[in-house]
Amino acid sequence: FYSIDHAPIMPTFAIPESFGTEEEYRKKFTEKDLFDEFTQDENGNVVMDEASAKAKIERLGGYEKLYRIKLEADYLAKLAYDGARRRYGEELDEEVQERIKFELHIMKTMGFPGYFLIVQDFISAAREKLDVSVGPGRGSAAGSAVAYCLGITQIDPIKYDLLFERFLNPDRISLPDIDVDFDDDGRGRVLNWVTEKYGQEKVAHIITYGTMATKLAIKDVARV
């Protein structure tokens, strides 16, 4: 069973072999290629010293893990740009291109491409296969243009000047938190779909409890 002290258990998103495989990536890219890609900024500029760069590679799981992350990142980029052309038209203007490029780089270098692939997968399934109503998105995830292009959210952050950095910020390492709303009747169908596809051992329910101090409890009861 999973416990709170266990390391995160992230299921693997099945990338079509026609797109690429880890074995192909190991032949195509050297460790130096990965080192540069994961420690430079989105424009290829060196932004950290060697010690910090090596620590970052280690934090991401070492080169063994980086090949998988890069494969996921490249496939995520394909889906994002495909979605961008549906959202913004075939000719993407410079602002849209730069925003997507920046966001994809942050997602990749923080090690989260697989997470976004899985989220877009079950949201797409909810809409297209399960006939479940999905909310338009709320919280900080609405600030992501990539999430908008993937169909995770339905709010254009560029149009409304929403900040991506409130959602993911490399200077404040934290797991991405995407609030997703499903209709009451369909929520169970989505959960069953995710469990069947990714495995029961990779799916968990989480509940939080809030407590009130004496003064607040009395005040809250008095409102009734």
Language-model regions: role of each:
Residues 1-224:
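Phosphodiester-processing cores and adjacent nucleic acid-binding clamps
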